[in-house]
């Protein structure tokens, strides 16, 4: 028994104070042993199957990713990750496939956009949160197209600021941007904006 607790202690340290039931079970430790461990170490249950030690920081973005694995950070949250805005997002924005029920996320104040399944993975990449965890996010080019596609729900200043910042970037990929714009049917309006900027 003690051997398993020691193993769990090591896992907890390696995971920076966060343990997932599924991860523990797949490492060969039974649920009853794990729940005894949770009680003995006084871990907090922060979400279904996710436990945190008292002294660890909650990485809200990573936690959101673990709980809603198909949600991809997008729109204003993606702008923040790519340094295309100086405004830290007040609420997280994610995109999920059409058909996924977003009510749980919306109830927690997360802004949810939907996209048909065949466009969900376009421009998908990963970034590190401020805590060092890897989460899925859309690249700069996809994000610009998303903002245009959802322009009725986005402040125009946010979009214009992002596009200006993007135009100054050395690592921009205009070819990918125009390719995505065609896929998301925003090519015409994007060209109008780019003609003014570039």
Model feature map: region roles:
Residues 1-4:
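Short, Lys/Arg-enriched anionic-surface-contact patches
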Residues 36-41:
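Basic amphipathic alpha-helical segments that dock to polyanions
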Residues 7, 11, 16-23, 27, ...:
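Nucleic-acid-binding surface
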């Amino acid at each position: 028994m003690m051997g398993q607790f020691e193993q769990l202690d090591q896992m907890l340290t390696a995971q920076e104070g966060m343990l997932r039931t599924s991860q523990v079970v797949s490492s060969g430790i039974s649920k009853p042993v794990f729940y005894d461990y949770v009680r003995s170490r006084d871990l907090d249950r922060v979400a279904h199957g996710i436990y945190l030690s008292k002294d660890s920081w909650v990485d809200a973005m990573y936690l959101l990713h673990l709980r809603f694995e198909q949600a991809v950070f997008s729109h204003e949250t993606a702008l923040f990750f790519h340094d295309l805005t100086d405004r830290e997002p007040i609420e997280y924005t994610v995109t999920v496939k059409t058909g996924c029920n977003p009510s749980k996320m919306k109830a927690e104040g997360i802004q949810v956009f939907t996209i048909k399944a065949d466009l969900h993975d376009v421009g998908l990449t990963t970034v590190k949160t401020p805590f060092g965890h890897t989460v899925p996010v859309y690249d700069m080019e996809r994000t610009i197209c998303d903002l245009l596609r959802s322009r009725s729900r986005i402040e125009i200043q946010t979009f214009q600021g992002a596009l200006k910042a993007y135009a100054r970037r050395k690592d921009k990929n205009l070819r990918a941007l125009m390719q995505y714009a065609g896929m998301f049917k925003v090519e015409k309006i994007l060209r109008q904006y780019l003609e003014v900027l570039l």
